[in-house]
Amino acid sequence: INLLAQSRKHSLALVTASKADNLYWLGRYTERVFTTLNQFFPFYDRVMDTDVDAFRPFARALDLPEDFQDFDAFIHSFLYDEKNPDSVRSAIVYAFNNAVILRPELSSRLLQYVELAMSSIVEAADRAAFDEDIYKHRDIADNMLAFWGGVENSPVDPTLKSFIFVGKYLERVDLYTRFG
């Protein structure tokens, strides 16, 4: 296999500053959603087992308030509040907004995974009072994994893929450094 000849067939995509910004933040926001949910549930499980203080390290890592007067209201705000810019729902909406702008480069097929995650968080918010919302979070995490796998295996220009994955891995380093 002549890799050099094959690499010459791929032209570099024109990457404007705004496109690079959208790709980068798409990667960051999708990673923020995925990692936050994966880190959230072990702490949440311990709280449900009657240890409210177990959630404080998670809150501290994300610079969230640690004194919860109403823990349920705090959780609802953290996961579902569309007016809270630090909520998981807001991160999904931000990812979706970036993905929509990039539809010509990424394709509708890849955009659908972010859109499905957004639908799932909205549905989870509607069911939060009934404790049925927890199951939707697995779907959201799965949609993020499907999105990244789809990007990796798509014919999207490697330069564009790189911007997404740079954002993704920088967010991962940031979050895992916080969580320790």
What spans do the regions from the language model cover?
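Alpha-helical transmembrane segments and their helix-helix packing motifs
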Residues: I1-G180
